[in-house]
């Protein structure tokens, strides 16, 4: 395991985190962590985020029961973005969807002509 120095200052004290379902490898969320949320995530084994809209720490699942248990945390080459694999209990999205990414804007079928 490699110890990295995450760069929280590059983006105003926050690091974006791409959240993957550990089993399916599907992207289920994009959220942000500040240093405190990162430390809470590391020590608790559950996901903690920084809510940009509410300006407060957010323990994923504390209200909904849809907890995320951390399986793996990887930093990108610049050490300013995280890729986090989780076991998702219930829906990841506040809409009740498994993933927050369900609005298909374009796919290869859109570019095919008859």
UniProtKB/Swiss-Prot annotation:
Mg(2+) binds at residues 76, 78, 80. Pathway: Amino-acid biosynthesis; L-histidine biosynthesis; L-histidine from 5-phospho-alpha-D-ribose 1-diphosphate: step 3/9. GO terms for cellular component: cytoplasm. Zn(2+) binds at residues 77, 93, 100. Binds 1 Mg(2+) ion per subunit. Binds 1 zinc ion per subunit. The keyword Hydrolase applies. It catalyses: 1-(5-phospho-beta-D-ribosyl)-5'-AMP + H2O = 1-(5-phospho-beta-D-ribosyl)-5-[(5-phospho-beta-D-ribosylamino)methylideneamino]imidazole-4-carboxamide. Its cofactor is Mg(2+); Zn(2+). One of its GO terms (molecular function) is phosphoribosyl-AMP cyclohydrolase activity. Catalyzes the hydrolysis of the adenine ring of phosphoribosyl-AMP. Belongs to the PRA-CH family. This is Phosphoribosyl-AMP cyclohydrolase. The gene is hisI.
């Amino acid at each position: 395991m490699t110890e990295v120095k995450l760069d929280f200052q590059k983006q105003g004290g926050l690091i974006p985190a791409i959240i993957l379902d550990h089993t399916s490898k599907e992207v289920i969320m994009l959220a942000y962590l500040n240093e405190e949320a990162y430390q809470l995530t590391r020590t608790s084994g559950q996901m903690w985020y920084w809510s940009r809209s509410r300006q407060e720490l957010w323990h994923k699942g504390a209200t909904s029961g849809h907890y995320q248990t951390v399986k793996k945390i990887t930093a990108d080459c610049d050490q300013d973005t995280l890729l986090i694999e989780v076991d998702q209990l219930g829906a990841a999205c506040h809409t009740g969807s498994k993933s927050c990414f369900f609005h298909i804007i374009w796919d290869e079928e859109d570019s095919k002509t008859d």
